[in-house]
Amino acid sequence: MKHSIIIPTLNEEEKIFQLLDFLEANALPDTEIIVVDGGSKDKTIDLAKRFKNVNLIETKRASRAFQLNEGARQAKGEILYFVHADVLPPQSFEEDIKKAISSGNDFGCYRFVFDKRALMLKFNAWWTRFDFMFCRGGDQTLFVTKDVFNKLNGFDENFVIMEDFDFILRARKQFKFRIVPKDVVVSARKYKLNSYFKVNMVNLYSYWCFMFGKSPEKIRDNYKTWLTFD
């Protein structure tokens, strides 16, 4: 089954080259690599254009759910693999995903570790091996058959944040989920710019707001107000 890797970007010049270089080196020859940019003002687009095997889709809408859906709409693969720009999958990701799907799973993710080896970050990462909803999220990457993705109508574009949680929550009600017992490597940049305690508290608050049906716009606004980003 052909795989399509879909990467949403917005001002990711610090990370996108590393990810695309890794994917070109480790993906199968027929695997499709799609970058969906939401209107970057930095060098993200120029960097993506350096890779001849990358299909770059430029949009002016900076909405991750929309970008992911647009990538999926144009993807030719039977399996979709959604990867954030600041994440590196294991070198074995192609085989891992193939095995997970062939074993009867419809969608899944990885565990993660951070690229900074602080003790408290190791504690956070440790939880991602467990099948708790709070432990999920797009940082762990997400693979899903295109058939299942289409049956769920993709990501809900009303979710301007936490679209990954919404998708997984809906998918788990109907389809079989698998956590691959290997780690992707996630950037700890958010923790470098903010305190460990602050990021965890904002994440916890955002999760409970999501679970209790609070407005995605309100969750996003609070998230951006309370945390510092690049």
Report residues per predicted region.
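Short, well-formed alpha-helical segments that are part of the catalytic scaffolds
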Residues: 11-25
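Acidic helix N-cap motif at the loop->helix transition within catalytic regions
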Residues: 14-18, 42-50
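Short beta-strand/loop segment that forms part of the nucleotide-sugar
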Residues: 20, 30-39, 57
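A conserved acidic beta->alpha catalytic loop
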Residues: 37-45, 87
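Glycine-rich, basic loop-to-helix element that forms the pyrophosphate-binding segment
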Residues: 59-75
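Hydrophobic helical membrane-anchoring modules
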Residues: 172-230
